[in-house]
Amino acid sequence: MNVRRVESISAQLEEASSTGGFLYAQNSTKRSIKERLMKLLPCSAAKTSSPAIQNSVEDELEMATVRHRPEALELLEAQSKFTKKELQILYRGFKNECPSGVVNEETFKEIYSQFFPQGDSTTYAHFLFNAFDTDHNGAVSFEDFIKGLSILLRGTVQEKLNWAFNLYDINKDGYITKEEMLDIMKAIYDMMGKCTYPVLKEDAPRQHVETFFQKMDKNKDGVVTIDEFIESCQKDENIMRSMQLFENVI
């Protein structure tokens, strides 16, 4: 990891602890998300000019090695913000890494650990996997991947905030508790490992969670609803700015 980027992430972590942010930046660049997720699809960038790319996804589905068949290309195109050609490229890359057509959690963790070798990304990858696994069947299909990627790369602020809320709502009950936020925060700090400079305080995750709830738990009932979450994020420039760190760890 580039030293300057590490220092930048460290600074953002410190800012997040003081502002209660740490979810998504309204004006942040999309390169980091795209680069990380495209690493899961190593053949996607290298074959864009190959004639084989022009083959339809429907033809690819006939291959016996693919056990999970994705939805019709036209339906995925309608449900996402990708073009038909982009979906073809993404599907080839996905299938190259995952011939079965789905990614289980262990494989997802192995892939994600390559992004943060200096720390332990296991727990955070678990939470991220569950955010992509929208039907909660223990596997991320091509459809799951595309729908999540479409929001992260090309979604509106509202869509991204909804996606981020789902990530922090670990038990998917429609609320974010202090315990859930603390679990996510600890997982992120574990993932960053010893690469941060200056070294973050041991109680930084807990301090951040307390600040987060002071800003977002409007009725002081100990949980944050989706409405409280979105309203607070959109009204607080500090929160929106510090949300940029989320792109660096996605």
Swiss-Prot record:
The keyword rRNA-binding does not apply. Ca(2+) 2 binds at D169, N171, D173, Y175, E180. Ca(2+) 3 binds at D217, N219, D221, E228. Residues 2-44 are annotated as: KIS. Residues 61-117, 120-155, 156-191, 204-239 form the EF-hand domain. Pfam families: EF-hand_7, EF-hand_8. GO terms for biological process: protein localization to plasma membrane; regulation of potassium ion transmembrane transport; regulation of signal transduction. Residues 237-250 are annotated as: Interaction with KCND2. Component of heteromultimeric potassium channels. Identified in potassium channel complexes containing KCND1, KCND2, KCND3, KCNIP1, KCNIP2, KCNIP3, KCNIP4, DPP6 and DPP10. Interacts with KCND2. Interacts with KCND3. Interacts with the C-terminus of PSEN2 and probably PSEN1. The KIS (K-channel inactivation suppressor) domain is required for converting A-type Kv4 current to a slowly inactivating delayed rectifier potassium current. This is Kv channel-interacting protein 4. The gene is KCNIP4.
